[in-house]
From Swiss-Prot:
Name of the protein this chain belongs to: Genetic interactor of prohibitins 3, mitochondrial
GO molecular function: GTP binding
Transit peptide, UniProt annotation: 1-32
Domain CP-type G: 158-346
InterPro entries xrefs: G_CP_dom, Mito_lipid_metab_GTPase, P-loop_NTPase
Reported function: May be involved in the mitochondrial lipid metabolism.
Gene3D superfamilies: P-loop containing nucleotide triphosphate hydrolases (3.40.50.300)
Gene Ontology cellular component list: mitochondrion
Keywords attached to this entry: Mitochondrion, Transit peptide
Length: 588
């Protein structure tokens, strides 16, 4: 049996695009519009299974009540003058004819204009684009509509960079997307072994977690910092660098012009590629409504924007590995870009997500506004050694005795302070229900012996402890220094981490510690009298450092530090860190 698909566009006749269901799938290359997997109907247990269900070729006719049907029948028999008496149009000028809405709808539904020949399809209409929102696999439907998923390697494939690049033509433009939440963890230096820096385009997304507006000094300072970092470290030209936000749809019109045609969007899993592509697509779709504001705001256009965001472009999800295959996205018939599955080098990435529901995963990745939570003006908590700072039970910072720190939280995770590491270890055997609100995994939290154990390299001044895809914790030592013992960090194996210089120093102006005449000021007067300056990246010192892997059997932490850097310097209990040598034991 033949099925008809009736589509109506503004000022265009209705089109019959397809005659059979198989023709639909052939034109769409048999791919899920949400994740890109090849669709199949044979095996429910294999990836890509889908059911047609209620689709565009099975749309139910609009329900019209019996009373309205009778009304329309009588109304259609009246002449225009009698019909005008039945409706409230006394304030309408006499020369403007008014047609009852109910009658108009019924006539259109009763006698649609149908073109029966395939060759009558407009040449500027891309069939794949029209079908973009029609067919999704069972996995994607369950995720989006039921919040139901099983995190495994079969349904959520996450490969390494080399394997992902092997699926992309060598001469195709690459757009590398990375997140502002965990910069620079999202940039894999191996990409420069495959492509020349001048042939790569870089986009920092999720910048709404760093500053609140898409324009202004913070945006400009951030762009300057990225130009310095990528330019001096990797020789990327500044015209190949862009910053924006897919979630807030910042600068998407400029982004549309920035990306080359037929480019492939690559990046770490969960970095925001699909959301960014979707935002570009939505911005172009909204051009069809010239009288409507395209800004996402708390106004009347929200429903239009949100509906467009739900119905066009690739699917988006907080789940890592959601996109499963390369997916073409057609934008306005003028540009084609490809959404590519994310990559990672962390083989344990899925472990934590197997134990979480979709709402909790969204909370894990949400982040918070650093401009509000992680500057010198922000609220902080004070932790004294040997206290342990819990990062909602997925990480534990153990501080040395006789030390004190101010902690500012730029994640969405809850912080909680415990007496010492012994107390934490005993709790993890059986987490009390009263502590469930501050333990992400609650009763499924592993014992401390199953966490990865690190030493934080020696640091001087403020540092950011960065958690991949999650955000960062700002750590500031305060008080007199009495020990060279190191901070220890216990972290769930599904998460990677680094420390870095405070990123806010590069997108905010900071204190010089001097007055307007250049005279040094005591710290108590900095807030009131100090001048400001903007830090610039020079590539002379490390911007970040890996943490030092360790085990419980390792006793001498000084030996571990020296073995980690192997630069001839010896860290010990007497070593004095200053502003001149503070990066001696950092390793990128």
């Amino acid at each position: 049996m033949f099925h008809r698909y009736i589509a109506q566009a503004s000022n265009k006749p209705l089109l019959r695009l397809f005659s059979t269901r198989s023709r639909v799938l052939t034109l769409f290359d048999e791919k899920c519009r949400s994740c890109g997997i090849k669709l199949q109907q044979e095996s429910p247990d294999k990836p890509g299974f889908f059911k047609l269900g209620t689709s565009i070729d099975r749309k139910k006719p609009k329900y019209i009540s019996e009373a309205n049907q009778k009304y329309n029948q009588f109304l259609s028999k009246l002449d225009v003058s009698d019909r005008d008496l039945l409706i409230n149009n006394f304030n309408v000028p006499k020369n403007i004819a008014t047609k009852p809405i109910s009658l108009t709808i019924s006539k259109q539904e009763e006698n649609p204009t149908v073109i029966e020949k395939d060759e009558d399809i407009h040449s500027d209409t891309n069939p794949a684009e029209l079908l973009e929102s029609d067919y999704t696999c069972i996995r994607c439907r369950d995720i989006h509509h039921r919040s139901k998923f099983t995190m495994n390697a079969k349904e959520f494939v996450i490969d390494e960079l080399d394997k992902v690049l092997s699926t992309i033509p060598n001469d195709s433009p690459l757009v590398y997307v990375f997140s502002a939440l965990d910069f620079p963890m999202g940039i894999n230096p191996e990409i420069f072994e495959h492509r020349d820096p001048k042939d790569l385009y870089f986009i920092m997304t999720k910048t709404d977690n760093l500053f609140p507006k898409s324009s202004g000094s913070h945006h400009d300072y951030c762009k300057t910092f990225l130009n310095d970092y990528l330019g001096k470290k990797y020789n990327v030209p500044p015209e190949n660098i862009f910053i924006g936000s897919g979630k807030k749809r910042w600068r998407v019109k400029r982004l549309y012009e920035f990306i080359p045609n037929y480019s492939y969007f690559i990046g770490h899993t969960n970095c925001g590629k699909s959301t960014l592509i979707k935002s570009i697509k939505v911005a172009e779709e909204l051009k069809k409504f010239p009288g409507t504001s395209h800004k996402k705001d708390f106004g009347k256009t929200d429903k239009l924007i949100d509906k467009s965001f739900a119905n066009v472009g690739p699917g988006v999800s907080h789940l890592p590995g959601f996109t499963r295959d390369i997916m073409p996205v057609y934008i306005n018939g003028n540009k084609t870009i490809y959404d590519v599955p994310g990559f990672t080098s962390n083989t344990y990435l899925r472990n934590i997500y197997e134990k979480l529901d979709s709402k909790t995963i969204a909370h894990l990745f949400r982040g918070s506004l650093a401009q509000k939570k992680a500057t010198y003006k922000s609220q902080y908590i004070t932790v004294k050694g040997p206290n342990v700072l819990s990062i909602e039970g997925i990480g534990f910072l153990e501080f040395p005795e006789n030390t004190m720190y101010q902690i500012r939280n730029s994640t969405d995770l809850k912080l909680h302070v415990f007496r010492d590491i012994t107390k934490v270890e005993s709790l993890l055997y059986d987490v009390p229900k009263s502590l469930y609100p501050v333990f992400l995994l609650q009763d499924q939290t592993p014992e401390l012996s199953q966490f990865n154990r690190y030493l934080v390299p020696p640091f001087y001044g403020i540092v950011d402890l960065v958690l991949e895809n999650i955000g960062y914790i700002n750590i500031k030592p305060v008080g007199a220094k009495k020990t060279n013992s190191l901070v220890k960090f216990y972290l769930h194996p599904s998460i990677n981490t680094i420390i870095r210089q405070p990123i806010m120093n590069y997108i905010n102006k900071t204190f010089t510690g001097q007055d307007e005449k250049g005279n040094p000021l005591p710290k108590r007067d900095w807030n009131r009298l100090s001048t400001f300056y903007l830090s610039r990246y020079t590539n002379e010192d490390p911007f970040y450092s890996k943490l030092i892997p360790t085990t419980k059997a390792d006793v001498n932490e000084y030996e571990q530090v020296n073995s980690f850097v192997s630069n001839g310097r010896e860290y010990n209990s007497e070593y004095a860190l200053t502003s001149d040598n503070k990066f001696d034991f950092w390793k990128e």
